[in-house]
């Protein structure tokens, strides 16, 4: 089905003004009044319609990733990975698939500067022959928490105070003082990469662990990585202040202007894979979203390239109404038991139904470009005309049948019902290794950002001591330096 077939007629194809229902408007400058100075009449339908439409132009803002920019292009397979997955769009080198990508900041509101220290969203929608595939990630390979139960609390801590409507450091460091698994993510957020130069010069990661399934049903755990061909570049704190003060939409402008000039952004896609039968061979849990997979023992494998060569035509239609969900996969790519991914599978689609309505997948930007059919009918803002009589399954009057079964390896699950943490937490090792990989100047900038966060007037001595203890367990010298700057005695 062509997702654009039932798109409402554009308002730009009439030579004169009309109402939404098509009636001609002979005066779009003045309201209907009694005489020159009399009251406005309620019967001025065009005025009422115009104001009512204006009053409803805005839809609910995304609870996270509100500020964003989109672009369109294609993904091309460059290396054969057919032995790992039966996904049709990865079937052979040379295969191209249309994509739309949305880059975003995470915590801050829709009109916020793009120079604030914040993770960046990196979401890709592939329009494949077997349906859409949404790879919904960030520019950092790990996350703050490993269990989605804490996601609402985490966002609340980052968001402005419900009392003052201001972002306050004491709220952030207080919340995460209870979650040492966040340390690895903070070695990215408080590092120089915490403020990318723009969207073209940043990495992308699927973050969560997915599963690739081959034609013979073999499963491999997989991590996805996007690497920009123009390299990774960042803004230091003082540079961000200058750039943000000059243009608070600098990253959107850079992306739009680059594509318009023919300087198309490009990323290479790599994967890391682990045999699903070998996931217990490491000192970390491969399903733990707070951990990276060491590239020296699990090397990157090239897959393809993505080129963005077309700007969007309408910001509202192709950015604000663009909707992603990690549950949207294709045969050959499946979920894992990653606890954060499991909660995202529900939450993303749920928030889109809240923002856009139950039929958000009918919107042209979200609809698949392949043929599709089901009995999901009606509902708010259902604008696709359907004339079939049979809206149930099965039926002898409707030849539609089940699709061919695609490979899905059987699994035997056993265990007690319980709420618990994972066995291999190992919260400090990778955070310490990353800190030690910084050069001395970069280490000092990282340290100073923590000093700034922990010297907020509301941060207590207890909270400071906890963070000194955490960073000491990552790296003894880092803990000592932080304690010295804070003028407190280290616990270790």
Curated annotation (Swiss-Prot):
Cofactor(s), by name: heme
Pfam entry (one): Catalase-rel
Active-site feature positions: 65, 138
UniProt binding sites for heme: 348
GO molecular function: catalase activity; heme binding; metal ion binding
GO cellular component: glyoxysome; plasma membrane
Record's keyword terms, sorted: Glyoxysome, Heme, Hydrogen peroxide, Iron, Metal-binding, Oxidoreductase, Peroxidase, Peroxisome
Subcellular compartments: Peroxisome; Glyoxysome
Oxidoreductase as UniProt keyword: yes
EC number: 1.11.1.6
GO biological process assignments: hydrogen peroxide catabolic process; response to hormone; response to hydrogen peroxide
InterPro entries tied to this protein: Catalase, Catalase_AS, Catalase_clade1/3, Catalase_core, Catalase_haem_BS, Catalase_immune_responsive, Catalase_sf
Expression by tissue: In whole endosperms (aleurones plus starchy endosperm), in isolated aleurones and in developing seeds.
PROSITE patterns registered for this protein in UniProt: CATALASE_1, CATALASE_2, CATALASE_3
Reactions that this protein is recorded to catalyse: 2 H2O2 = O2 + 2 H2O
Biological role stated in the UniProt entry: Occurs in almost all aerobically respiring organisms and serves to protect cells from the toxic effects of hydrogen peroxide.
PANTHER family named among the record's database cross-references: CATALASE, CATALASE ISOZYME B
Similarity comment: Belongs to the catalase family.
Subunit structure: Homotetramer.
This protein's name: Catalase isozyme 1
Organism of provenance: Hordeum vulgare
